[in-house]
């Protein structure tokens, strides 16, 4: 069976992963040799608790694809401020630099207010 990392990277070429959400996941998981190697703290940095599952909530590729499919039409807004992230590297969404720990990645600000 393919590793989840291989599955995601290969799937990045499909329409599923042409969404910004999919590109983010493909980029993030590429830093890990295996899904289980992603540290729980890193997962908490990526997601706010507002109805977005954490990385370690996905036990297999099927659940991951379902999540991407369920969110493929979601517009993502990001903050335009420099924040440190877990890998000390930049990541751009629509030309804007974001950090992995920004809670606005999935549409919420620090206070949990929905942005879109």
Language-model segments: residues:
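Acidic, low-complexity, intrinsically disordered interaction modules
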Residues: 25-112
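Proteolytic processing junctions in secreted/extracellular precursors
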Residues: 4-11, 70, 80
